[in-house]
From Swiss-Prot:
Recorded domain comment: The nitrogen atoms of the two glycine residues in the GGXR motif define the oxyanion hole, and stabilize the oxyanion that forms during the nucleophilic attack by the catalytic serine during substrate cleavage.
Glycan-linked positions: 115
Residue span, PNPLA domain: 32-230
Origin species: Solanum tuberosum
InterPro entries given in the database record: Acyl_Trfase/lysoPLipase, PNPLA_dom
The protein, known as: Patatin group D-2
Motif (GXGXXG): 36-41
Family, as annotated: Belongs to the patatin family.
Positions of short motif GXSXG: 75-79
Tissue specificity annotation: Tuber.
Annotated active site: 77 (nucleophile), 216 (proton acceptor)
Key words, A-Z: Coiled coil, Glycoprotein, Hydrolase, Lipid degradation, Lipid metabolism, Plant defense, Signal, Storage protein, Vacuole
Location of the motif DGA/G: 216-218
Superkingdom of the organism of origin: Eukaryota
């Protein structure tokens, strides 16, 4: 009798724990963040293709798309382009691009985007005309409010000297942010020295014209927009009672997937103090942005890893990054077929690598684990909505 009673108590405890786990999963906010990096966007594109493929298998649904699973998708520069591709609706109100179409997009258009050199020593390296053309053709007249999930795409206004973040949740108070997606995409990709800044106008709540003079989002958020994406997710939660559990920035209630475009561990070893002691403005100008981006990306990852671990929720944060790029794969604008093939290989090889020295789990295993959480959460919400 005592054994039976103990067994029943154990069953009740298991059911209670399971129920609590699923309730917690149902309440979680899911965030996808994609770094900038020009043609190196092929690397996160390869990772996204793997993740979406796993979700399709788990849910037995070939039409499953990443926008169905993430509450917030954010990106800067090429990450902003990827964000638009997987959240902008087509005529059937589904994402106009599946994840497995991202890499082919780069192969088709990359050589043209990074081939229209202006030939001006004092001007941008590329004229940006083909980039704008392909964005208009693919994104059409779609605006921010039509995105299939919340987005967070950053840019920087060089006239007001302020960052500009395009999100759906800010449109009620700032309708001027409801810009066309192709204007936003070009702006977040308009890296100084590579592409010209972008000027366009929208309308304010009073119907007045509002001007934008924008450059690359990395100027505003550096190359890693993960913190930006989290802040948007937190503000989104403040407005939605379903996400009440994360209003105090409880990372236990957040799933964050952050995708990098690769760095090189050798970069910091390239120069010595003795060598750079005699450098002037021109020499520093050629490398300082890369140094700043690499350092800031590292610090963002370090901060997020620390705060997630402090709340005993380190499994809720996954940073997918290749830290050992070499040769032409380090370049933002080498769109030669050979280099793009190498970038695909980098992404595929990355899946087999361990997440860190302290975590033997491979990126492939970690992404499968993330996919399972995303799939289960979607099913739980669908079941709740059906009642």
């Amino acid at each position: 009798m005592a054994t039976t009673k103990s067994f029943l108590i154990l069953i009740v405890m298991i059911l209670a724990t399971t129920s609590s786990t699923f309730a917690s999963l149902e309440e979680m906010v899911t965030v996808l963040s994609i770094d900038g990096g020009g043609i190196k966007g092929i690397i996160p594109g390869t990772i996204l293709e793997f993740l979406e493929g796993q979700l399709q298998k788990m849910d037995n649904n070939a039409d499953a798309r990443l926008a169905d699973y993430f509450d917030v998708i954010g990106g800067t520069s090429t990450g902003g382009l990827l964000t638009s591709m997987i959240t902008t609706p087509n005529e059937n109100n589904r994402p106009f691009a599946a994840a497995n179409e991202i890499v082919p997009f780069f192969f088709e258009h990359g050589p043209h985007i990074f081939n229209s050199s202006t030939g001006q020593f004092f001007g941008p390296k590329y004229d940006g005309k083909y980039l704008m053309q392909v964005l208009q053709e693919n994104l059409g007249e779609t605006r921010v409010h039509q995105a299939l999930t919340e987005v967070a795409i950053s840019s920087f206004d060089i006239k007001t000297n302020k960052p500009v973040i395009f999100t759906k949740s800010d449109l009620a108070k700032s309708p001027e942010l409801d810009a066309k997606m192709y204007d936003i995409c070009y702006s977040t990709a308009a890296a100084p020295t590579y592409f010209p800044p972008h000027y366009f106008t929208t309308n304010t709540i009073n119907g007045d014209k509002y001007e934008f003079n924008l450059v690359d989002g990395a100027v505003a958020t550096v190359a890693d927009p993960a913190l930006l994406s989290i802040s948007v997710a937190t503000r989104l939660a403040e407005k939605d009672p379903a996400f009440a559990s994360i209003r105090s920035l409880n990372y236990k209630k957040m799933l964050l997937l952050s995708l990098g475009t690769g760095t090189t561990s050798e970069f910091d070893k390239t120069y010595t103090a003795e060598e750079t002691a005699k450098w002037g403005a021109i020499q520093w100008m050629l490398v300082i942005q890369r140094m700043t981006d690499a350092a800031s990306s590292y610090m963002t990852d370090y901060y997020l890893s620390t705060v997630f671990q402090a709340q005993n929720s380190q499994k809720n944060y996954l940073r997918v990054q290749e830290n050992a790029l070499t040769g032409t794969t380090t370049e933002m604008d080498d769109a030669s077929e050979a280099n793009m093939e190498s970038l695909v290989q980098v992404g595929e090889n990355l899946l087999k690598k361990p997440v860190s020295k302290d975590n033997p789990e491979t990126y492939e295993e970690a992404l499968k684990r993330f996919a399972k959480l995303l799939s289960d959460r979607k099913k739980l919400r669908a079941n709740k909505a059906s009642y």
